[in-house]
């Protein structure tokens, strides 16, 4: 690859000799510098400003390093076409880092003196990408020192999310080396590219949960059980010196030298052991830089900001809480005199702020309701309780401490009617909370008839109920209280709040309030979410099922779109648009424990992303309602939300705002905006129970929360005003539409919006010198700076990389259109495409350097060449320079071919796509595939689900050897097993959980029988199973016989012992396999679906089978004619009507 010497562009010969040379010196190749200028440059201060400077913000503002990345001013857009174009660029354009994200990568990197930063950015504005932009600047540190960039996240789901963000936020950095743009890439190839990219990412990043980091730094405390009387207490073991004994991890982290530590949702590490671990590593590590991410840096109290900022400040110059806040705690806390000024001084240089929430890319939040007397800004829907609930409420003493009062909250949510504990009393008493629910369960089990009859004759006497037997009963193996008391007709007597919310939810249909997606948030699970789920089930809503055939549609099942139910949906009025019936469904999202962190189960996370957030589901066709707990506060995005319901009170309004932020995020409503509805709104409904005189406990709790929230917002305003990028990000924090709308907000008639913390949206930065010189009070913006005023003292080639990359991208754009350009052409195109407001700062050097990188000359250049260019035919190549022309050169052509052959290209068809991939992407293949892929079986390669059956098998004792039916590994598939199953086996596992973690304990799924066990081992199992050994049997034969015996033992045994484990979603073997358990399972399912408590008569019938030592039986279930009305449900379970009975045979 050699060309004539006189054809080589001089730019290519001139490589970068000194990265710290001034750009103006570099761009002028033959410039002469006078001795006086040399002396002046030698005396220049090439240092960054210190956070201790009072004019720190001004010094940052005028630096070329940062000013180039200021957010440009946006004018008011008046026409829909202008708004649509703006949104298309922001929401649907190709991904690129925002100016704010790039700015931070120039502020925190290995070459700047700044140690750490709190990224106080709003929800959904790109915190993760900002942190990743910083991290990418540390990759050469990873290569140099053999360390890794460490990222701490709350839990496993967040870990996967952050990995996804790395791939998204870095463009083609990790993927371009694995993809060939000249061929069709199918889904399998995309997955392969992604997998390879993640492998590269993992060479630079180490992502772990807070808890894992804590274990690797400090170690878990060793706890002992101490039994005193009937109580068991856990105590932490201590050494002789009084320190806690700890279980130290093998791969312990002692320090993180020469790298970067990122902590996502950093407010979670204050006041706990995880924070202690972070502090220890920061204190002992050398040259460690730290980035904290948080939309709500204060969890509950304003003074938690002190601990968070102190992680970033020098160890010997920490912020003191008592100089800022008064000694009171909770809602009584306030600023001390001089506290604000001291706080400003101590946070200066350590905070970046970006509000985001541009009204053109964020839906508008509309708070519904009224502000009760005594509250300042919280709008709520007040629900006045009826006599029964109010009587119980009056007997509950309101708590006065600063915590969530679970008793009063439980009463506010739901009061269950029950028999009096005084046997002589015939009154109905109210029960609430978990204890109350347990009491009601016992009463239903022991005295259901009396209880229901008494409820009908007292509380519900006005309804004249003829058959009260279904008012309350138990379902799901007697664990769930259900019944008609949850029906809308009676619900208001037991929960006025849930009744009011249900009425409004029912109206979210066409012709009333229009159909749309709903998010319901409750902090309490067992006395909140579980009860409201039952309310929905009893009022025509169904729990979401991935297989639509599993829905049990009844006459009163609600339609997702209109107000007509399933029974009369066939006869819709003409004024309702034609639509197919799909049931209105919901899904509950509560946490599962993962290293003491509440995490969303992966399966539900997938459903939220793929089903609920799908634009085709924008009206709730497939999934209408999400009910979530506090696990939904962070890391989840809900798209196209129409309404949000907050059904219980949290003592921390910041947490409530985080929950609301799940549905109001950057571009989440982009897919449903149109000219008729250009500005989508999200209604936020906060429900509280109320009393006629004074405030209820829920309203009082909101009042306390307001006091804390106001102080937190005052602290946040100080952080906003002192942020390093305050003047640079001003146009991303204050928007022209809001300036006009909320110009004089703060009165009762015109309150300031929640997005601005119920304070005026406009604010000035804290630097007085900056404001005096650059603030324009008439336009409420900071003035532009001319190029001559900019400080170039610390600007170098490394910081110019973003502009160079921009130039490369534009040059690559050009070669998609033509094959040959002059330098003049390229300079003109790149400059013209540069943003107008920054064009003055554009330097020709960026284009020179970009061209230099795109033209490999030496063999070493080719070996390290990554800036591949593609022409209009997607051929990969590079640039060559010949006689003042820059010419596209394909990799597979000689450099001396005439231009005619460069312009003419016949794409070869050989080996561009293999036959297998071609066939798999044809409609014929997909149609053929679907014929053999039943809907209820799901995707052919779907993994078996053992997680959901773990509790079932853990509750049973195990036989000495346990078999497992698992999906065959892809590495072992040979086409001989049509079912795709393989039989595994293992020894019995210990019953106690702690013993299961010891060395040598077999895994839950065991090992493949036919390949991992020798014949001697298998023979001992056969002996244990009373099977005769055949010497001619192969290992495969022996395994088949063992499997058959364990299969029948599992199926027919009645001793509650596990012999064979099967997944819940096996396409052919039902779960549970054990017939005795399956009988109870079917009975419970029928109870749940019919909402009845009727038990069938069960007959056990003996039969014969393969093994003489097994008692073979089957069961018959007999339901009488009272179940005729549930004919459709019974037939689904195989029931047949014989004489007057419905009979289900289970065998």
Curated annotation (Swiss-Prot):
Localization, UniProt: Virion
Binding site for ATP: 121-128
Extent of motif DEAH box: 264-267
Molecular function GO labels: ATP binding; ATP hydrolysis activity; DNA binding; RNA helicase activity
SUPFAM superfamilies: P-loop containing nucleoside triphosphate hydrolases
Membrane-spanning residues: none
Main location (coarse class): virion
Record keywords: ATP-binding, Helicase, Hydrolase, Nucleotide-binding, Virion
Keyword set includes Protease: no
Superkingdom per UniProt: Viruses
Pfam families membership: Helicase_C (PF00271), ResIII (PF04851)
Enzyme category, top tier: hydrolase
Cross-referenced CDD domains: SF2_C
InterPro entries (alphabetical): Helicase/UvrB_N (IPR006935), Helicase_ATP-bd (IPR014001), Helicase_C-like (IPR001650), P-loop_NTPase (IPR027417)
Similarity remark: Belongs to the DEAD box helicase family. DEAH subfamily.
Protein's recorded name: Putative ATP-dependent RNA helicase L377
Species: Acanthamoeba polyphaga mimivirus (APMV)
């Amino acid at each position: 690859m050699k060309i004539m010497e006189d054809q080589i562009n001089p730019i290519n010969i001139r490589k970068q000799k000194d990265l710290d040379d001034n750009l103006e010196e570099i761009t002028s190749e033959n410039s002469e510098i006078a001795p006086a200028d040399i002396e002046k440059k030698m005396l220049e201060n090439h240092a960054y400003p210190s956070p201790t400077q009072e004019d720190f913000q001004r010094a940052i503002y005028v630096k070329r390093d940062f000013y180039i990345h200021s957010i440009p001013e946006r004018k008011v857009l008046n026409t829909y076409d202008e708004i649509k174009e703006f949104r298309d660029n922001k929401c649907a354009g190709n991904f690129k880092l925002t100016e704010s994200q790039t700015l931070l990568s120039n502020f925190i990197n290995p070459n700047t003196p700044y140690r750490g930063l709190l990224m106080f950015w709003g929800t959904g504005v790109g915190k993760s990408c900002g942190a990743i932009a910083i991290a990418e600047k540390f990759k050469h540190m990873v290569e140099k020192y053999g360390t890794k960039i460490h990222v701490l996240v709350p839990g496993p789901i967040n870990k996967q999310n952050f990995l996804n963000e790395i791939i998204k936020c870095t463009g083609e950095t990790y993927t371009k080396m694995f993809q060939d743009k000249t061929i069709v890439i199918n889904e399998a190839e995309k997955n392969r590219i992604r997998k390879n990219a993640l492998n590269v990412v993992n060479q630079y990043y180490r992502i772990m949960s807070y808890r894992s980091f804590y274990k690797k730094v400090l170690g878990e405390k060793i706890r002992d059980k101490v039994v005193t009387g009937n109580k068991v207490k856990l105590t932490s073991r201590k050494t002789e010196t009084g320190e806690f004994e700890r279980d130290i991890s093998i791969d312990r982290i002692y320090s993180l030298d020469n790298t970067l530590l990122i902590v996502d949702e950093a407010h979670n590490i204050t006041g706990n052991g995880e924070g202690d671990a972070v502090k220890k590593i920061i204190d002992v590590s050398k040259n460690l830089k730290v980035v904290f991410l948080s939309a709500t840096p204060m969890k509950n109290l304003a003074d938690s900001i002190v601990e968070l900022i102190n992680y970033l400040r020098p160890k010997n110059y920490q912020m003191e809480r008592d100089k800022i806040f008064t000694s009171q705690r909770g809602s009584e806390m306030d600023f001390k005199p001089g506290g604000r000024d001291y706080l400003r001084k101590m946070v200066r240089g350590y905070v970046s702020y970006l509000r985001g929430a541009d009204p053109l890319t964020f839906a508008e939040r509309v708070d519904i309701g009224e502000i009760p007397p005594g509250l300042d800004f919280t709008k709520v829907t007040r629900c006045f309780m009826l006599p029964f609930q109010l009587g119980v409420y009056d007997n509950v003493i309101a708590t006065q401490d600063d915590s969530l009062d679970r008793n009063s909250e439980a009463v506010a949510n739901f009061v269950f009617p029950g028999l009096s504990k005084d046997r002589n009393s015939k009154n109905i008493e109210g029960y609430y909370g978990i204890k109350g629910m347990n009491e009601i369960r016992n009463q239903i089990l022991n005295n259901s008839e009396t209880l229901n009859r008494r409820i009908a004759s007292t509380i519900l006497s006005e309804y004249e109920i003829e058959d009260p037997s279904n008012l309350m009963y138990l379902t799901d193996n007697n664990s769930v209280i259900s019944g008609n008391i949850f029906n809308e007709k009676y619900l208001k007597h037991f929960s006025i709040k849930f009744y009011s919310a249900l009425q409004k939810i029912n109206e979210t249909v066409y012709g009333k309030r229009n159909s749309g997606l709903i998010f319901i948030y409750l902090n309490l699970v067992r006395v909140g979410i579980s009860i409201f789920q039952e309310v929905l089930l009893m009022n025509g809503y169904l729990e979401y099922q991935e297989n639509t055939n599993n829905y049990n549609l009844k006459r009163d099942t609600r339609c997702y779109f209109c107000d007509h139910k399933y029974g009369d949906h066939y006869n819709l009025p003409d004024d309702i648009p034609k639509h197919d019936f799909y049931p209105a469904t919901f899904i509950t999202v509560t946490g599962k424990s993962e290293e003491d962190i509440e995490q969303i189960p992966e399966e539900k996370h997938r459903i939220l992303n793929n089903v609920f957030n799908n634009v085709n589901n924008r009206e709730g066709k497939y999934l209408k309602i999400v009910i979530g707990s506090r696990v939904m506060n962070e890391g989840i995005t809900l798209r196209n939300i129409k309404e949000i319901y907050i059904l219980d009170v949290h003592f921390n309004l910041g947490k409530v705002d985080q929950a609301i932020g799940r549905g109001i995020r950057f571009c989440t409503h982009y897919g449903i905006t149109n000219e008729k509805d250009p500005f989508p709104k999200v209604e936020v409904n906060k429900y509280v129970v109320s009393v006629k005189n004074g405030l209820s406990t829920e309203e009082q709790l909101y009042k306390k929360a307001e006091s804390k929230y106001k102080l937190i917002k005052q602290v946040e305003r100080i952080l906003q005003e002192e942020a390093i990028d305050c003047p640079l990000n001003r146009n991303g924090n204050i928007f022209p539409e809001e300036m006009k709308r909320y110009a004089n907000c703060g009165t009762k008639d015109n309150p300031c919006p929640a997005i601005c913390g119920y304070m005026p949206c406009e604010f000035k930065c804290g630097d007085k010198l900056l404001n005096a010189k650059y603030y324009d009070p008439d336009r409420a913006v900071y003035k532009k700076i001319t190029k001559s005023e900019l400080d170039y003292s610390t600007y170098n080639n490394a910081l110019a990389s973003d502009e160079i990359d921009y130039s490369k991208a534009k040059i690559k754009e050009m070669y998609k259109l033509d094959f040959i350009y002059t330098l003049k052409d390229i300079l003109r195109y790149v400059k013209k495409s540069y943003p107008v407001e920054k064009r003055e700062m554009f330097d020709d050097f960026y284009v020179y350097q970009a061209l230099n990188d795109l033209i490999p000359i030496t063999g070493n250049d080719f070996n390290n060449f990554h800036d591949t260019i593609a022409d209009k035919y997607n051929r990969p190549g590079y640039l060559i320079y010949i006689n003042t022309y820059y010419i596209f050169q394909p990799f597979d052509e000689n450099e001396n071919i005439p231009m005619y052959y460069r312009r003419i290209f016949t794409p070869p068809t050989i080996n561009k796509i293999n036959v297998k991939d071609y066939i798999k992407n044809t409609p014929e293949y997909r149609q053929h595939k679907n014929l053999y892929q039943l809907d209820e079986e799901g995707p052919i390669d779907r993994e078996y689900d053992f997680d959901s059956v773990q509790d079932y098998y853990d509750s049973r004792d195990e036989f000495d050897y346990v078999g497992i039916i698992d999906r065959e590994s892809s590495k072992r598939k040979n086409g001989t097993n049509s079912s795709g199953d393989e039989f595994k086996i293992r020894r019995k596992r210990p019953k106690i959980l702690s013993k299961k973690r010891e060395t040598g304990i077999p895994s839950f799924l065991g090992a493949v029988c036919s390949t991992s066990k020798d014949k001697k081992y298998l023979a001992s199992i056969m002996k244990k199973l009373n099977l005769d050994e055949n010497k001619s049997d192969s290992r495969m034969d022996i395994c088949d016989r063992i499997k058959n015996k364990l299969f029948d033992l599992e199926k027919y045994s009645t001793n509650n012992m596990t012999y064979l484990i099967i997944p819940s979603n096996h396409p052919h073997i039902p779960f549970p396999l054990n017939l005795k358990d399956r009988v109870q399972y079917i009975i419970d399912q029928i109870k749940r679906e019919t909402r009845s408590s009727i038990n069938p008569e069960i007959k056990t019938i003996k039969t014969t089978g393969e093994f003489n030592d097994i008692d073979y039986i089957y069961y018959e279930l007999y339901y009488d004619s009272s179940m005729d009305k549930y004919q459709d449900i019974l037939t689904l379970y195989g029931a047949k009507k014989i004489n007057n009975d419905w009979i289900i045979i289970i065998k």
